[in-house]
Amino acid sequence: AATLAASIMAVCYDNQDHPEYQNLTNVFYFITEMCSDYRGALPLQFYIDSLPEEHPAKILLAATKVAAMRTRSSFYVSAIMTLKLLTIPAINQMSNKSDFDIGKMIDEGKKIIIYLCLPARDKTYFPLASLVLRQLSDLIDYAADEKYGGRVPVRWNFVDDELGNFTKITNMRQQTSFGTGKGIRHFMFIQSYAQLDDVYGEKVSQI
């Protein structure tokens, strides 16, 4: 997780003048290029050494130098596998920029529906939808605190049909507890609570 977070930070910070490069596909290629052996060393180490002290990714990336090489390799492989879906051209094109502005939608307060349609027969792309839902809730949460005193003016309703058959949404616990006060409400449609236990664990599913 630290390797992935640091790589995202590096790609975003180093491309402040080129927002079109600030996407997860480029994070994938950053890791694969920086963490491949080159003349007995990793380019990532030279990159870390070249960073100014004020670079936000320096400390996060420097932490990887402490681990043994075999352990580091497992970090890099894990990060690459997490992002592998984003190398598919169609997914890259879809995910490298947004077609709508959530901040603008919150400000305008108009009625709108965002559909996420996924085939039940194949869960390959479910993690991407989980990521979208996580980002949506984060943006609503941020807008609530920064612009509206803690709660957005118009409530956002998430209709979670067949949530028990869906991949884990990493901040679902926060969304269903603290999120209600921010203007985020979830309607969960499941076949049994055992499904939620399987995905989120018994403690979280009971919330």
List PLM regions with ranges:
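P-loop NTPase motor domains
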Residues: 1-184
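Conserved ATP-driven motor cores of ASCE-family P-loop NTPases powering translocation/secretion/packaging/pilus
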Residues: 176-207
